[in-house]
Regions:
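Active-site-proximal specificity loops/subdomain of glycosyltransferases
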Residues: 174-186, 191, 195, 223-286, ...
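Short, acidic/polar
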Residues: 195-203
Length: 543
């Protein structure tokens, strides 16, 4: 029988003859080798991990587990808490809380978190709220604006703060989702306010160009307040009492907050206003009562702001410089003329720190001049973007704020016709057109002719009493330091709470007040808040 070639033999693959064909590529041998190589691979990965990353892992773990050292027990005042069912920048069911907090509670106050508990009809959630501030952490002022933010439940009914098992319920309110106009101006808290002419200029010019005024008042001459109240009754302005910080119940000494916070914590008032309107308007501005903004080559603030943003995603805010002007004022309410105030204005050689106007979805808090949290923040516009852009303020070059720095009393017979000054930004165009000025004056006369307003004329201040006192105190406290370029934030806390304001019986004032509440003692922070705010005629013109 002829012998067949060896390569034609059928090779029986089985475990029984595995040894017989030891150098062949047997499937079981392939499987065994693969398992062996996988084991080697994972052992090698473990070896590399232990050699090169062990120390880094130990550092991360120790950092996470190490508690934040508590420096002292402190007190915090809660100004407001807002709830957002939906927010463009805060997300769904968001909570934002505005506080004045002692930064020396821990080494770095923004490292601290607050436990918040939200409850609705069916659930109860506990989450940590993160803290941010608009102030510099090396500021000399011990108390700062601190904003706490987290996201909780839909249809939330109650909100509590918790620390080591101790809980405190705090009131909250829903943010606005509708506003009278697409632009809102947040006016700094007024105290010992008596120059009512600035309100008339601010309101009627802002109205012409499409902004709603949100006012905050600490104290004010009573007749001036009554004038503003008539505008408020007509829905033309909104007014909020800005409260003096008080800790109604404490079990030991504490650092007095009003003397150790920057300028009555104006930043907290501006942040409160931003959070109140952030879902309701297209633009928010922060300014003082005597900061007048007039659009340049635009019919409205909205038109100018949209033009300046130009669709950019990296502009955090529009910054307008403040140019100082010296002008006149007259005593009679029926004799008021914004045309006369504008046409008799003369530019002073000085200027002041500018103010900002911004899209509210681009920031969740603000300082008195701009948002330090939003400026220079990284932003990614596409998933494929490897390096971020950085948000920054845009300095508006062709417009500036008409700052009513100084207003002198004059007799009506001494008012000159004058002429419209040039725009303080470009120094070429007119500050305002004759047609717009005539339109504003017509609206002013219409309002002042209303019986409920015209009857206030005899009661309004006809001389300056508080303004010179406040200016002198401010100058002695910090203006002269600032003007000589020696005002450093880590050396001087810009505060004038110690200013002495002598009261006059013939010049009664209203002052903000409320029912103050203190929560249970908590570690390391005990919380305080106020409810049912109102204006009292029994306190006087104080800060």
């Amino acid at each position: 029988m002829k012998e067949l070639p060896a390569y034609l033999y059928q090779i029986p693959y089985s475990l029984l003859n595995y040894e017989k064909f030891r150098y062949k590529m047997h499937p079981f041998r392939i499987l065994k080798a693969s398992v062996f190589l996988l084991i080697l691979y994972f052992l090698f990965r473990i070896f590399l991990y232990s050699v090169f990353f062990e120390k880094a892992v130990q550092v991360v773990v120790s950092t996470q587990e190490e508690p934040i050292p508590i420096l002292q027990e402190t007190h915090t005042f809660i100004h407001s808490v807002y709830y957002y069912p939906v927010s463009k920048s805060l997300g769904q069911n968001a909570i934002a809380m505005v506080t004045t907090m002692n930064k020396r509670t821990v080494p770095t106050i923004t490292d601290l978190t607050i436990n918040m508990i939200g409850t609705n009809r069916t659930a109860r959630w506990k989450k940590e709220a993160t803290l941010t501030t608009e102030h510099l952490l090396n500021d000399r002022c011990d108390y700062l604006l601190i904003t706490a933010q987290t996201n909780l439940l839909e249809n939330m009914r109650t909100l509590e703060i918790e620390a080591e098992g101790v809980m405190m319920e705090i009131p909250f309110k829903k943010a606005k989702y509708h506003a009278p106009k697409p632009v809102v101006f947040c006016v700094s808290p007024q105290f010992a306010a008596e120059q009512w002419q600035t309100f008339l200029v601010q309101y009627h010019i802002s109205k012409r160009y499409g902004a709603h005024l949100q006012l905050y008042i600490v104290s004010m001459v009573e007749s001036y307040y009554k004038l503003i109240s008539e505008y408020e009754k007509l829905g033309l302005v909104s007014v909020e009492p800005w409260l003096t910080i008080k800790f109604s119940e404490t079990d030991g000494p504490f650092l007095e907050p009003n003397r150790n916070v920057e300028l009555r914590n104006q930043a907290a008032a501006h942040t409160d206003c931003l959070l109140m309107y952030k879902e309701a308007v297209s633009f928010v501005g922060v300014l003082d009562m005597d900061d007048i903004l007039i659009p340049n080559n635009a019919e409205s603030y909205y038109e100018e702001f949209e033009r300046e943003y130009s669709g950019s995603w990296i502009i955090s805010a529009l910054s307008y410089g403040k140019l100082d002007f010296h002008t006149i004022k007259v005593a009679g309410l029926e004799d008021q003329s914004i045309s006369a105030i504008v046409k008799n204005a003369r530019r002073l050689p000085t200027k002041d720190t500018g103010k900002s106007f911004f899209r509210p979805e681009r920031m969740n808090s603000t300082w008195s001049h701009y948002s330090r949290n939003s400026d220079k923040q990284p932003i990614y516009l596409a998933p494929t973007q490897s390096e971020p852009f950085y948000m920054e303020r845009k300095i508006v070059k062709y417009n500036g704020m008409f700052h009513l720095k100084k207003m002198d009393w004059v007799n009506l017979t001494d008012v000159r016709d004058g002429s419209i000054p040039v725009n303080p930004g470009d120094n070429i165009t007119q500050l305002i057109s004759e047609a717009h000025l005539a339109e504003i004056d017509s609206d002013l006369r219409r309002m002042l002719s209303m019986e409920q307003i015209s009857q206030l004329s005899s009661t309004l201040p006809k001389d300056d009493y508080y303004m010179p006192i406040v200016f002198k105190c401010y100058n002695e406290s910090f203006y002269h330091i600032r003007d000589t370029a020696f005002l450093y934030n880590d050396i001087t806390c810009v505060n004038a709470f110690s200013c002495e304001l002598p009261q006059r019986d013939d010049l009664p004032c209203i002052h903000s007040d409320a029912t103050y509440h203190s929560g249970p003692k908590m570690w390391p922070i005990t919380y305080h808040y106020a409810s049912d705010a109102f204006f009292s005629s029994d306190i006087g013109c104080y800060q």
